[in-house]
Amino acid sequence: MNLIWGFLILILVLIFLGVFFSFVPLGLWISALAAGVSIRITDLIGMRLRRVPPGVIINSLIKAHKAGLSEVTLDKLEAHYLAGGNVDKVVNALIAAQRAGIPLTFEKAAAIDLAGRDVLEAVQMSVNPKVIETPVVAAVAKDGIELKAKARVTVRANIERLVGGAGEATIIARVGEGIVTTIGSAESYKEVLENPDSISKTVLAKGLDAGTAFEIVSIDIADVDVGNNVGARLKMDQAEADMRIAQAQAESRRALAIAREQEMKALTQEMRARLIEAEKEVPLAIAEALRSGKIGVLDYYTLKNIIADTAMREAISKLGQKEEEGRKD
């Protein structure tokens, strides 16, 4: 009977130890004590209950302790992890900042990490500036010649402006705008080709890093190429447009002239019809004059001779015009 009770107690002890060691990573606790980090067993159990991986927190705390970061505590690391932050990266960034002599607190590093920035990369960029290449920027000088420029922008991360500061895209856009402004204000494209550093000096003096997460160290023009003669092309396009406008105006005047000609022809036909209608009244008037004795028979024949003579002259005149037109043809 005692043997059975002893066996049951052994089983219960083994179950208790299994549950205990599942909650308490004993090896991690020993490692922390060996590194001089004071950790209570209850802290490890609490992390398990809060579903916080003790390995991530304890190892980061050991690194911070060995680096002399006294401000980093267990509660801060656990709170940052529960907020969705990257504890290991924050501690590595603090160590790198301390070695480089960059003032960076845990709260600032945690805020940068929670803002979605890579805090470790930001610290490294503060020590080793990063080079950003802009795409080819095309601009036109005052003489109408297009220039295509490409720049290299050396930037250093500004730790104080990482939260809420604009990113690389803003730097590239502002540098491109500065290049366009500088080339556009040049009297001749030759001025830019002779002094390409004038672009970088002008752009750098504009303070383009205001409101961004970076500090511009230098702007270097990598390449400047001559593009199209935009001014000449615009003049050609303008001349072609003017020619089309003139052609349209000429066509409009021609249409008006044709319409006027047709109108005059219609008016001529109308006048001719009135003339014929009036000529129909002449014989009646002559007959009435003969009947009333206003003219005599001799006067009548004299009038007929005049009419015949006029008709003959008109016929001869028309014949002469036809012969002259035939010679011209």
Swiss-Prot record:
Query: What family name appears in the similarity comment?
Result: Belongs to the flotillin-like FloA family.
Q: Which HAMAP family does the entry mention?
A: FloA
Species the sequence originates in: Dictyoglomus turgidum (strain DSM 6724 / Z-1310)
Domain of life of the source: Bacteria
Q: Where are the transmembrane segments?
A: 4-24
**Keywords, ordered alphabetically:** Cell membrane, Membrane, Transmembrane, Transmembrane helix
Is Lipid biosynthesis given among the entry's keywords?
no
Cellular component GO terms held in the UniProt record: membrane raft; plasma membrane
What membrane topology was assigned to this protein in its record?
Single-pass membrane protein
Q: What is this protein called?
A: Flotillin-like protein FloA
Q: Where mainly located? A: membrane
Quote the subunit structure annotation: Homooligomerizes.
Pfam families membership:
FloA
Task: Write down the InterPro entries for this protein, in alphabetical order.
Answer: FloA (IPR022853)
> What's this chain's function?
Found in functional membrane microdomains (FMM) that may be equivalent to eukaryotic membrane rafts. FMMs are highly dynamic and increase in number as cells age. Flotillins are thought to be important factors in membrane fluidity.
Q: Where can this protein be found?
A: Cell membrane; Membrane raft
